[in-house]
Structure formats: structure tokens, C-alpha cells
């Protein structure tokens, strides 16, 4: 088990609570498969706890809370059908497949000689 006394200790009570919440969420995360809704929600909660910006964390927590309120325990264990494509989630980014679809490729034009 992780020992908080051996590792760097937070300076504030809030930091200590966040550290404990983070460790607890990491332990709960192992209960869910990586492709389930429960896993995504736990990872999002970890992101909220680790966030240093209060307004951003509050906004993200509201989103998580809304998603969690409508989910049953069985739904948390089910595989996620839609993948999240939000820009702030590195775990959802796919490998770059080359060029973007909206970028046109430049074509070489032969030199035109003047008459």
C-alpha cells in the first residue's frame, strides 16, 4: 500500500485530501476495464482532483456528475460505444493518420513559356 509519510507530503489540508482522493480513485480504477464508462468517469474524476484551476475543475465535475447520475451500475461496466473526441483528453486521441481531410494537396505546375 502507498505510504503518504514516506513520499512528499502536501503543504495544505486541501492538498492532503486531494492526494488521498487521487490514490483512492486510482485503486477504484482497477475495478473497471479500460473501454468502459466507469473507467472513463473515474479517469475524468482523477483529472478533476488533479486540476489546479478551480473554475475548470468545477465545470468538468458538473459534466461528470450529470453523466454519473443517469448511469446504473451495469452501465458503468458496459463497453463504451462512442469514443470521446474532446481535445483535452490524451487517452482519446488517435494516432495521426497523415493529412487532414480538409487540407488540399499542392500540385506541381509545369513552367509556362512566354511566346
Swiss-Prot record:
A Pfam family annotated for this UniProt entry: WCCH
An example Gene Ontology biological process: negative regulation of gene silencing by regulatory ncRNA
Keyword terms: Host cytoplasm, Host-virus interaction, Inhibition of host innate immune response by virus, Suppressor of RNA silencing, Viral immunoevasion
InterPro entries linked: Gemini_V2 (IPR002511), WCCH (IPR005159)
Major location (coarse): host cell
Example of a GO cellular component annotation carried by this entry: host cell perinuclear region of cytoplasm
Record's subcellular location: Host cytoplasm, Host perinuclear region
Family of this protein: Belongs to the geminiviridae protein AV2/V2 family.
Quaternary context: Interacts with host SGS3.
Function of the molecule: Through its interaction with host SGS3, acts as a suppressor of RNA-mediated gene silencing, also known as post-transcriptional gene silencing (PTGS), a mechanism of plant viral defense that limits the accumulation of viral RNAs.
Designated name of the protein: Protein V2
Species per Swiss-Prot/TrEMBL record: Tomato leaf curl virus (strain Australia)
Amino acid at each position: 500500500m502507498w505510504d503518504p509519510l514516506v513520499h512528499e507530503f502536501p503543504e495544505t489540508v486541501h492538498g492532503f485530501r486531494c492526494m488521498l482522493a487521487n490514490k483512492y480513485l486510482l485503486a477504484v480504477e482497477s475495478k473497471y476495464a479500460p473501454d468502459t464508462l466507469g473507467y472513463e468517469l473515474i479517469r475524468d474524476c482523477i483529472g478533476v482532483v488533479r486540476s489546479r484551476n478551480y473554475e475548470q475543475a468545477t465545470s468538468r465535475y458538473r459534466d461528470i456528475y450529470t453523466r454519473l447520475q443517469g448511469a446504473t451500475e451495469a452501465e458503468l461496466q458496459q463497453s463504451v460505444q462512442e469514443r470521446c473526441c474532446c481535445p483535452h483528453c490524451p487517452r482519446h486521441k488517435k494516432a495521426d493518420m497523415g493529412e487532414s481531410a480538409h487540407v488540399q494537396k499542392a500540385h506541381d505546375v509545369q513552367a509556362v513559356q512566354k511566346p
